[in-house]
């Protein structure tokens, strides 16, 4: 089989206004998996990234929207670019960067829902319902060290024999912490 991923990326950078925008569209398919006329399959082309980054000061910025997150070797939070479709996150990330002391800190939040409603609803997709993380990185003269803490909330059904309603759903949180030193 032949698997294909095609991406087109656009970016806009306005240093005077301290704004950066990025967008990536992608098409992932296996050759021959759809009709050649392909008028019925509407799931091939998708938005992989669509984000904006605002610099508040010399040290602080925030990046909001659908974006790739990739920290250290990508094992805890990564773009998994080894898979054809890759991975992006709907998140807001507050970033701190001090080039003098070589310190980076990223604090991110994500909250997923299936529709545009103010009411609480069942989230039965196989993604996190809520996610929070903090990544600390420091470059020293001879090595680079970082630590990542992730709080991941997955929604689940309490009693599978009962109807799937919001009262029969809970969020289970798991915490993961990991570090990396590169010499």
Language-model-derived ranges and their functions:
Residues 66, 73-74, 79, 86:
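Generic secondary-structure boundary/loop-capping signal
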Residues 37-40, 76-82:
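"Short basic amphipathic alpha-helical interaction patches in structured regions
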């Amino acid at each position: 089989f032949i698997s294909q991923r095609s991406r087109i990326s656009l970016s806009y950078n306005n240093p005077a206004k301290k704004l950066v925008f990025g967008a990536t569209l992608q098409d992932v398919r296996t050759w021959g998996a759809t009709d050649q006329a392909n008028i019925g399959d509407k799931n091939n082309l998708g938005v992989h990234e669509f984000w904006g980054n605002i610099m508040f000061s010399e040290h602080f910025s925030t990046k909001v929207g659908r974006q790739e997150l990739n920290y250290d070797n990508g094992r805890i939070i990564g773009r998994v670019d080894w898979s054809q479709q890759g991975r992006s996150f709907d998140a807001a990330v507050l970033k701190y960067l001090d080039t003098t002391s070589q310190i980076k800190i990223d604090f991110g939040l994500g909250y997923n829902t299936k529709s545009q409603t103010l009411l609480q609803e069942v989230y039965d997709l196989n993604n996190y319902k809520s996610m929070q993380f903090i990544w600390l990185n420091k470059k020293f003269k001879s090595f680079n060290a970082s630590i990542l803490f992730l709080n991941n909330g997955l929604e689940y059904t309490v009693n599978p024999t009962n109807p799937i309603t919001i009262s029969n759903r809970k969020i289970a949180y798991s915490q993961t912490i990991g570090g990396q030193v590169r010499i």
